[in-house]
């Protein structure tokens, strides 16, 4: 969240994030599918539940942001989001609707299948 806070504080109105789904269906605003490179833990996000990820720290200090938290904390930010799995697409649609963020989220993907799936809903 600290990166998004910094962007907002500097006056940026648009941010970008990838989202990965945890094993129990929580969307995380995180670039990598694995924890190994950026955190103090190891493993794949999609194989772990949020209860075990909530204590993981990015660069040893910052928690991984939940997408719902990001959308709620920064209602004035426009967010470009890439769902990184098919599972994340359905969860993303539900999260956007639940947070009322339809008019400030742009969804993009290098996967045509994911984009078609998103557009179909």
Give the ranges of each region predicted by the language model.
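Phosphate-group recognition and catalysis centered on beta-loop-alpha active-site segments
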Residues: 1-121
